UniProtKB/Swiss-Prot annotation:
GO terms for cellular component: cytosol. NAD(+) binds at residues 269-283. One of its GO terms (molecular function) is flavin adenine dinucleotide binding. FAD binds at residues 10-15. NAD-binding protein involved in the addition of a carboxymethylaminomethyl (cmnm) group at the wobble position (U34) of certain tRNAs, forming tRNA-cmnm(5)s(2)U34. GO terms for biological process: tRNA methylation; tRNA wobble uridine modification. This is tRNA uridine 5-carboxymethylaminomethyl modification enzyme MnmG. Its cofactor is FAD. It is found in: Cytoplasm. PANTHER family: GLUCOSE INHIBITED DIVISION PROTEIN A, PROTEIN MTO1 HOMOLOG, MITOCHONDRIAL. Keywords: Cytoplasm, FAD, Flavoprotein, NAD, tRNA processing.
Length: 622
């Protein structure tokens, strides 16, 4: 009999992080995948990070996960998105060499203690007394465990569509998990269908690069991981082109041949990553749509045309591509396709990502209705950690919305569910000033240390970093100027008689350590990385203090009970639609009311104010 503490099913981004987190927790862990050689495959675009997504990668790294380190090893075009905007919404991103990324992930897993890799297919769960106690494999039979983490990605009943052609597959060239999907239905799990897509892969040597504008990498690459000392790979350029009226005409003439518009596809696709057919149908008034030509590797002939996801027949794909500047003679290496797959309604999960109806079964990644490598990896880490802790008899880990984007995502999924693939954006976080990509380690690494999943090397580096920051902050807080002294140095402050520290002055627009060091030379000894952290911290200090108060108020308000006698129809300012929903659901607390679909912060504020006013009036009349 084969016995493990935790079994992970699936070797994509969620599965790899789940396996690593479980094993780092000390649990004897097995990772089951169709192909060990495919572990860590980037199934769609060759990039990691971006707006919102880059925050998740930094958080994964702060918890000692794999994705950030692998991206740094494989990164061939690092760019910090939104560089000109505030630090809270800046998004680190890199193009990655697919082969190098996969190689890095596989190396991490092969070197991980407490982890064994198994090449097989899961076809059923072992359930005893309504609790999951293992899996059944196609070749090796029963694997018993204390917990199971399902990270099936697009493989669960996956169907590929290209025009009128359809076949079962998890991704191009790999078969789907049909048996497991059928077995899940017998456990009365609420399943749905979603869809995603990918563009054709193009031959690099058949593209006319000379006529295209280029997008360069940042001169000073910003890595994802605290452990990365230097970006080693050479940095490459991407090219930019556009669709045109001729492209759009070909798509319109053949729209009936698209699997998406012929009625063959049932599942909804990601709103923020539409197919090119969707773009033309929904935004037909535009004369063109931007396409990024992204190399898939340093020594690879494959180009990923970001922005051209499609399920049109291959002949139509060739025709539309050759209307685009630079692609007049292009050859397709692999056609674009749409893929449909089963997902589980995430409202059936707890915030540990355990299925309520089947204790011992944890779900992570696209099976929970999300889209994207980063979203999957973050869920995988949390699910693997909680699976290991459940087996070890330890307290469960729930990450709050005010602590991390991971917490925002999980709360959104569990509380609100999904009607389309969920993608992370900074706009989803109420407290994004505190949840910056630059302070992910300060927010999460001490917690990860308590949970026992951080290496000694990372913990030492983190402590050294924080020590440098504490020392620099202390220096700045001990240096003062009066308003007259500030004016003498050309600094514009209010002449209110208040002495201001160097730390206070850093909150002023266009202020920097470099400028202050002209008359406070001791500031010149602060290293550049610490300078950046200190300047951001000081810039946000006042706002963060207010946000901390808001977080405390939210936590207090969430515990506020809603009287059963409360008539929501009497609360002015609430929409009639929301009044009807609330009255029907009858939430017992503000925390319950938050979970109602369509509930907004403004509406919550109206309800809280109304309840508090009623309480005051009742107290005054007593």
């Amino acid at each position: 009999m084969q016995l493990y503490d935790v079994v992970i099913i699936g070797g994509g981004h969620a599965g790899c992080e789940a396996a690593s987190a479980s094993a780092r927790s000390g649990a004897c862990t097995a990772l089951v995948t169709h192909k060990i050689s495919a572990l860590g495959t980037m199934s769609c675009n060759p990039a990691i990070g971006g707006l919102g997504k880059g925050h998740l990668v930094r958080e994964i790294d702060a918890l000692d996960g794999l994705m950030g380190r692998a991206a740094d090893i494989a990164g061939i075009q690092f760019r910090l998105l939104n560089r000109r905007k505030g630090p809270a919404v800046r998004g680190p991103r890199t193009q990655a060499d697919r082969k190098l990324y996969k190689k890095a992930i596989q190396k991490f897993l092969q070197e991980q203690d407490n982890l064994i890799l198994i090449e097989d297919e899961a076809v059923d769960l072992i359930v005893k007394d309504n609790c999951v106690s293992g899996v059944v494999l196609k070749k090796q039979g029963e694997l018993f465990s204390g917990a199971v983490v399902l990270t099936t990605g697009t493989f669960l009943n996956g169907l590929i569509h290209i025009g009128d052609k359809t076949w079962a597959a998890g991704r191009m060239g790999e078969h789907s998990s049909v048996q497991l999907a059928e077995r899940l239905k017998k456990y009365d799990i609420n399943l749905g269908r979603l869809k995603t897509g990918t563009p054709a892969r193009l031959s690099k040597k058949t593209i006319n690069w000379n006529c295209l504008s280029k997008q360069k990498a940042d001169e000073d690459p910003v890595p994802f991981s605290l452990l990365t000392e230097k970006i080693e790979q050479p940095q490459i350029e991407c090219a930019i082109t556009r669709t045109n009226t001729q492209t759009h005409q070909i798509i319109r003439e053949n729209i009936h041949r698209s699997a998406l518009y012929s009625g063959m596809i049932e599942g909804l696709g990601p709103r923020y990553c539409p197919s090119v057919e969707d773009k033309i149908v929904k935004f037909g008034e535009r004369d063109g749509h931007q396409i990024f030509l992204e190399p898939e590797g340093l020594n690879d002939d494959t180009i990923y045309p970001n922005g051209l996801s499609t399920s049109l027949p291959e002949d139509v794909q060739v025709a539309l591509l050759r209307t685009i500047e630079g692609l007049e003679s292009v050859k397709i290496l692999q056609p674009g396709y749409a893929i449909e797959y089963d997902f589980v309604n995430p409202q059936q999960l707890t915030k540990t990502l355990e299925l309520r109806s089947l204790p011992g079964l944890f779900l992570a990644g696209q099976i929970n209705g999300t889209t994207g490598y980063e979203e999957a990896a973050a869920q995988g880490l949390l699910a693997g950690l909680n699976a290991a802790r459940k087996v070890g008899g330890l307290n469960e880990i729930i990450i709050s919305r005010s602590t991390a984007y991971i917490g925002v995502m999980v709360d959104d999924l569990v509380s609100r569910g999904v009607s389309e693939p969920y993608r992370m954006f900074t706009s989803r976080a109420e407290f994004r000033l505190s949840l910056r990509s630059d302070n992910a380690d300060a927010r999460l690494t001490p917690l990860a240390q308590q949970w026992g999943i951080v290496s000694q090397k990372r913990w030492d580096l983190y402590q050294q970093k924080q020590q440098r920051l504490d020392q620099a902050r202390s220096i700045c807080q001990k240096l003062f100027l009066t308003p007259n002294q500030a004016s003498a140095h050309g600094l514009q402050v209010n002449h209110d008689g208040i002495r201001r520290s160097a730390y206070d002055l850093l909150a002023y627009p266009h202020m920097s350590i470099e400028r202050l060091s002209h008359f406070w030379q001791q500031l010149q000894s602060i290293d550049p990385k610490t300078v950046e952290s200190l300047e951001i911290e000081a810039q946000y200090a006042v706002y963060l203090e207010k946000q901390a108060q808001d977080i405390s108020a939210l936590q207090r308000d969430e515990r506020l009970e809603i009287p059963s006698s409360l008539d929501f129809q009497t609360i002015s300012g609430l929409s009639n639609e929301l009044k009807t929903k609330i009255q029907k659901i009858s939430p017992r607390s503000i925390a319950d009311a938050q979970k109602i679909d369509g509930m907004t912060p403004a509406a919550l504020s109206l309800i809280i104010t109304y309840i508090q006013r009623q309480r005051r009036e009742k107290a005054e009349s007593a």
